[in-house]
Amino acid sequence: MHFTFLALAAAGLLMLVQTTAAEAQFKYPAAPTSNQVDEYKGVKIADPYRPLENPDSPESRAWIEAENKITFDFLKAIPERDEIKKRLTEVWDYERFGVPFKEDGHYFFSKNTGLQNQNVLYATTNFSEAPRELLDPNLLAKDGTIALGGLDVTEDARLMTYGLANAGSDWQQWKVRDVTTGKDRQDLLDWVKFSNASWKKDGSGFFYSRYDKPDEKDKLRSQVYNHKLFFHQLGTPQSEDKLIYERPDQKEWLFNAEVTDDGRYLIITVQRGTDPKNRIFYKNLADPNSKVVELLDKADAEYNFVDNEGPVFVFRTNLDAPLGRIISIDTSKALKIDELISESKDKLEAVSSVGERFVAVYLQDAHSAVKLFKRDGSPDGEIALPGLGTAAGFTGKRKDSETFYSFTSFTTPTEIFRYDFDKHASELLFRPKVKFSPDDYTTEQVFYQSADGTRVPMFISYKKGMKRDGQMPTYLYGYGGFDISSTPSFAPANLVWMEMGGIYAVANLRGGGEYGEKWHEAGMLHTKQNVFDDFIAAAQYLIDNKFTSTQKLSIGGGSNGGLLVGACITQRPDLFGVALPNVGVMDMLRFQKFTIGWAWTSDYGSVDKPDDFAYLYAYSPLHHIVKGCCYPAMLITTADHDDRVVPAHSFKFAATLQAAQGCDKPTLIRIETKAGHGAGKPTTKIIEETADRWAFLVKELGLKVSK
C-alpha cells in the first residue's frame, strides 16, 4: 500500500503542466505525452512520455529537432567554445598506433595520423619499412560514420575477414579481403552482432555468430534473441552457411567461437547476456561428424580459454578464486580441474599464452602489473612497466619469441612496446609526439571510505602547481558495473580539461572488476546502491579535502555510468554543480524491453521478479525526479542510432527533468545524429561533442579559460 501511494504520487507530480523557472528561461518544447500507466506487482506507475520511445514518429522528430536547437544555440553562444574546440583539435592531432599482432611473418596494426575519423589498418613485414595500407574505413563514408568492428586473419596471412559497423550500430556486416591485393572477395555476411570471427587453420572458411534478419523498421529498437553459431565456407553465399550450434530453448544465450592454436578444436564460449559467469563447450574439428561437447555447463564461474596442449585445455577462471587463477582440464579424462597458477592478492585481469610462457596481467589497486610464468605454472619474472598505468595486448602464439603491448596512463598517451622473450627485455616501438608536455601533469591515487566503511580507490589528475583551495573546477567520472575495471588511460579530451585548470578524477566503484568478483557482486542486483554511495562518497572526499566545492564539482559517466549520474543527482541534487550523463540507462523499469537490454538483468535484476522490482524502482533515475527540486545544471547526451541503450532513456529523462526543474539551472539534451553508443564514433564528432561538454562546464562552473 505504501509503495502504491508513492508511485501514484510521483506520477501525479510529473504529469502536472506548469512553467518552472528553467522553462521560463529556456522555453523547452512540449514533449509528446500519453496517459500510459503500467502496473508492476500491484504498483501503478505513470509513464507520461512513453511516446518518446518511438524516435521516428513525427511528434518525436519535432521534439528532437526543437531540443537540439535550444541546446546547440546555447552552446554556440558560450564565448570560450571555439577556443576549446581549437585546442582540442590541436591536442588530438598526433599520430597513434594500435597494438600489432603477427601472422606468418606479417604484422598487422591500426594507425591514425591524428584527425582521421577512423583508424586505418596496415600491414608490414618489417617495422623499419613503410607499412602497406590494408583497409581505410574513412573511404567508405564521407562523414566517417563507418567503422571497423572486428578482424581476423588467416594463419598464412593471405586473407582477412572484417566487420563494419554503420553509424555506431551494434549490427555489423562482415566481408573478406585478399591481403595481397587489398581487394574484397564476394563473401558478404549480414546481421552479425556481438560476434568475433575465427578462421579454420586451412583458410577454407571461418566461424561466426549472428541473429536472424530483424524487421527493418525496428532493427534499432526491437529485442534480439536466439544467437546462432555458423561456419562460412569461403566463396559461398551466406544462405549456405553451416549451422554449428544453436539453443532455441535458451534464447538469451550468446555464442563466440575460437579455433585453437593447433587447429584441432573449436572452443565455444557461451554467455547469458552480460553475466561474466559463462559456459564452455567445444567441438573436435578433426572429426567432421563430432558433436558439440558441453565441457563446463553450470555457469558457476567465469572461464576464459587461454591455450591447449592437445586435449588439455587451460583457462583463466574465478572458480573458487574471486581474484582469479589459472587451471587446466584434461578433456580426454573424467572432468578434473588441476591448478597451474594459484590465486594471488591481486586481481588476475588477463592471461595469454605466448612463446612457451603465460603472460599474466594483474591489477594492483586498479593499475597494471605483468608477470610471466612457465608452462608448468612456475614464476618466470615480470615485465617492467613505465609507471602507474594500464598495460594491454600481449598477443601471440606458442612458437613466437616476441609479443607486443601498449601502455598508457592519465597523462601518458598510448605507447607501443615489443617484448623479446629471449632477451627478457622490452623495446619501445612507438611513442607519440604530442603538442603538450606530459611532465606538466600528475596523478595521485587516494583511498576514501564509502558509506558502509568500504575502502575505495580514486585517481586524481591535474596540472602541477594546482592550489588546493577548494575552488578547483572538477570533473568526477565513474562507471561501477558489469565487472568492468576503470583503469588509467589517456584521452586528449581530459588533457585539455586539465590544461584549462580542471581536475579529472576517476573513482573505482564497487560493481566494477578492480578487486575481483566479490567487488563486482558488492555493486550489483540488490547491492547496486553501494555504487551510488561510493560515488557520492568520492564527491564528498574531493570537497572535504579541498580539491573542489559543490559549486565547482561536475560528474559524468556513460551507459551504466549514465545511470550512475542519474541516480546520484536524484539522490543528492545538492552535492553537484553540473552533471553530464551520456547514453545513460535511466528507466530501470523498462530497460529490458529494448534491443539487448534483457542482457543486463544479470547486473540489474528484472522487474518481473518482485524483489528485484522493489530495488530497481528504489533507484530508477526517471522515477525519482521531484517537481520543484533544484537539480544541477545538466547536459544530457545521447545518439539517435544507439541500439544498445536506446535514446528513449535520455529522452524521457530530459523531458521529465525539464518539467520538474525548480530553479534556473539549464537542463539540456544533446542528440547526436548518425551515431550510436560510442564505439566507432568519428573523430570529428568526438571533438565537437567534447567541445560542447567542456564549454558547458566552463560556463556553469565559472572556469576562466586563457587563450
Predicted features along the sequence, with ranges:
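Bacterial N-terminal signal peptides
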Residues: A7-Q18
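Active-site-proximal cap/loop segments of hydrolase catalytic domains
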Residues: V506-K707
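Blade-edge beta-strand/turn elements of extracellular beta-propeller
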Residues: L135-P137, V179-W191, T236-P248, A286-L296, ...
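A flexible loop/linker signature enriched in serine peptidases of the S9 family
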Residues: N112-N119, A141-T145, L164-Q173, L188-K193, ...
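Non-catalytic accessory segments flanking enzyme active sites
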Residues: P58-V153, G163, W253-N308, E339, ...
